[in-house]
């Protein structure tokens, strides 16, 4: 069976030791930082492009700088609490202090999304500015961060896919990745992180950029947010078919790791959380076109 060996890349970009304590910059942290900075620059560019707006941009550059702080808090707190509540509530209920151990991993995009939306609504109410136009700005600028995050997932050798015999399957390191029932020898898996980087990062960014810069969709508040939500939800829903589910959902009677099932059919937790995003996205698209 042909497969691609996992590249020997350290999850740490570099580390330094000060006063007996080791500080390391991990690729995952760098992806968060770079994603936020790129997103900020993209939003700033859209705010400055007067032709994109019917009655001017929804917020000033100073308000954008203040919003960035709210978004950072929403991403971190929402992402962490989403993982705690959606994926391992029993563990963290028994060990509540483990919630603070963010360096051990455990972030949820869907939780981060809810955190950012909460921060966005609170900020807009405080600043007395319209929510949907600002949401459109954030939606159009989010995919580069998703792309970098998925590449960091790949470098960390985490969130890999299900076993595959396809020639581009990757032999991820680690006992968990190489534990494949019914497969002897090397176990190759779908590089689902790369699939997601291409779909929710590159493809979604290309579509949103076309709609913003060529089609003028920022003139219809909610339309860009709707495309982002429906697009991310749909791509995540599809990739879940080849993505290895979280270990806590997998058992002898549930080898596919379905969080909900009936008569042998069901959905993973990622698919369950993506369905509301798809429905909300479609609603926003229809609403924006109806009120145009």
Curated annotation (Swiss-Prot):
Q: What is its main location?
A: membrane
Per UniProt, a 1,2-diacyl-sn-glycero-3-phospho-(1'-sn-glycerol) binds at: 150
- According to its UniProt record, the EC number is 2.5.1.145
Q: What is this protein called?
A: Phosphatidylglycerol--prolipoprotein diacylglyceryl transferase
Q: Which InterPro entries match?
A: Lgt
Native species: Cereibacter sphaeroides (strain KD131 / KCTC 12085) (Rhodobacter sphaeroides)
Molecular functions per Gene Ontology: phosphatidylglycerol-prolipoprotein diacylglyceryl transferase activity
Q: How does it sit in the membrane?
A: Multi-pass membrane protein
Q: How is this protein annotated for GO cellular component? A: plasma membrane
Q: Its GO biological process terms?
A: lipoprotein biosynthetic process
Catalytic class of the enzyme: transferase
Pfam families cross-referenced by the UniProt entry: LGT
Checking PANTHER family in the record gives:
PHOSPHATIDYLGLYCEROL--PROLIPOPROTEIN DIACYLGLYCERYL TRANSFERASE, PROLIPOPROTEIN DIACYLGLYCERYL TRANSFERASE
Q: Which UniProt keywords apply?
A: Cell inner membrane, Cell membrane, Membrane, Transferase, Transmembrane, Transmembrane helix
Q: Which domain of life is it from?
A: Bacteria
Where in the chain are disulfide-linked cysteines found? none
The record's similarity note reads: Belongs to the Lgt family.
Cellular compartments annotated: Cell inner membrane
Per its database record, what is this protein's job? Catalyzes the transfer of the diacylglyceryl group from phosphatidylglycerol to the sulfhydryl group of the N-terminal cysteine of a prolipoprotein, the first step in the formation of mature lipoproteins.
| Transmembrane parts of this sequence | 18-38, 67-87, 105-125, 193-213, 222-242, 266-286
Name the pathway it acts in. Protein modification; lipoprotein biosynthesis (diacylglyceryl transfer)
């Amino acid at each position: 069976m042909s497969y691609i060996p996992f590249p020997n890349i350290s999850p740490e970009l570099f580390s330094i030791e000060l006063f007996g304590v080791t500080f390391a910059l991990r690729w995952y942290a760098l992806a968060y930082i770079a994603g936020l900075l790129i997103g900020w620059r993209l939003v700033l560019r859209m705010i400055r492009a007067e032709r994109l707006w019917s009655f001017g941009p929804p917020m000033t550059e100073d308000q954008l700088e203040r919003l960035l702080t709210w978004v950072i808090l929403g991403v971190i707190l929402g992402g962490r609490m989403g993982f705690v509540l959606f994926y391992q509530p029993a563990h963290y209920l028994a060990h509540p202090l483990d919630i603070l151990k963010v360096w051990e991993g455990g972030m949820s995009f869907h939780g981060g999304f809810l955190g950012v939306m909460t921060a966005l609504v609170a900020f807009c109410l405080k600043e007395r500015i319209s929510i949907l136009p600002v949401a459109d700005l954030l939606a159009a600028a989010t995919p580069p961060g998703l792309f970098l995050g998925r590449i960091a997932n790949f470098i960390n050798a985490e969130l890999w896919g299900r076993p595959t015999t396809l020639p581009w399957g990757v032999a991820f390191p680690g006992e968990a990745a190489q534990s494949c029932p019914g497969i002897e020898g090397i176990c190759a898996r779908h590089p689902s992180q790369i699939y997601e980087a291409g779909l929710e990062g590159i493809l979604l960014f290309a579509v949103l950029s076309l709609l913003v810069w060529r089609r003028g969709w920022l003139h219809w508040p909610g339309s860009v947010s709707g495309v982002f939500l429906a697009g991310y939800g749909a791509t995540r829903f599809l990739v879940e078919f080849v993505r290895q589910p979280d270990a806590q959902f997998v058992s002898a009677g549930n080898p596919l790791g379905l969080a909900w099932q009936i008569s042998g059919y069901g959905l993973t937790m990622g698919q369950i959380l993506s369905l509301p995003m798809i429905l909300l996205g479609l609603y926003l698209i229809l609403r924006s076109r109806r009120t145009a």
